A protein has these predicted regions:
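Core dinuclear metal-dependent hydrolase active-site scaffold
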Residues: 2, 34-108, 183-187
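Cap/insert and terminal regions of metallo-dependent hydrolase folds
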Residues: 12, 18-21, 95-185
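Helix-loop-beta element that forms the nucleotide-linked donor phosphate-binding surface
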Residues: 23-35
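Alpha-helix capping/helix-boundary segments
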Residues: 3, 19-20, 38-40, 154
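Short loop/helix-cap segments at secondary-structure boundaries that form the rim of catalytic
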Residues: 21-26, 41-43
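A short acidic, amphipathic alpha-helical/loop segment
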Residues: 2-6, 26-27, 99-103, 164
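Short active-site oxyanion
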Residues: 7-13, 86-88
Length: 187
């Protein structure tokens, strides 16, 4: 409710089709719903970015019907989004699933991955976001040049602390490619 009250209804929001519809019903006038692999090119002056919706899944197949749909996003920055100068992947709140294996084929050469971690559990049982092991598994699938864990301690339902991910990263040999940032620190 607090977010709804403070949300600028005129700001552009790129999200899932279902969330775009719900936001429009709340009075947001510039929502864009992207299904998996849909693209949106955005230009402002000479600045260009292509946003590609990547697959995400908030729960196991049976639980998906009870949870909102989610998406990741790939941002291609540069004068020609088809040949980006920089490519960034934001996982969104997903779990590991087979569709993630399509990412390196469809959008290869990811420079930076922002990994939503935390191992969120609903009712203490149902995992709906990646934990430490899942985060490393995603790194192995997507093979980004660099990665930063985010969204790992924002709520009490997060059960997989950042220290667990740091241990898994080191054990998997990814220590030189993963950067750990304190809140407010820049990359």
């Amino acid at each position: 409710k607090r977010v709804q009250q403070k949300l600028d209804k005129n700001i552009p929001i790129v999200t899932t089709p279902g969330a775009a519809k719900a936001l429009k019903n709340l009075g947001c006038v510039r929502t864009i719903g992207l299904a998996h692999w849909d693209r949106l090119d955005v230009e402002k002056g000479s600045t260009r970015v292509r946003i590609t919706s990547a697959p995400g899944r908030h729960g196991k197949l049976g639980a998906q019907a009870l949870l909102p749909s989610v998406m990741g996003a790939v941002y291609d920055f540069g004068a020609d989004p088809a040949q980006p100068a920089y490519r960034m992947y934001v996982t969104g709140d997903t779990l590991i699933h087979d569709d993630l294996k399509d990412i390196p084929q469809r959008v290869p050469g990811i420079d930076l991955a922002l990994l939503h971690l935390g191992g969120t559990r609903i009712l203490g049982v149902f995992k709906v976001t990646m934990d430490a092991q899942d985060g490393v598994q995603l790194l192995q699938i997507v093979q980004p040049r660099h990665a930063i864990p985010i969204h790992y301690n924002d709520y009490d339902v997060f059960k997989s602390p950042l220290a667990d991910f740091a241990r898994e990263v080191k054990a998997a040999g990814w220590g030189d490619r993963v950067r750990f940032l304190a809140h407010g620190e820049r990359y």
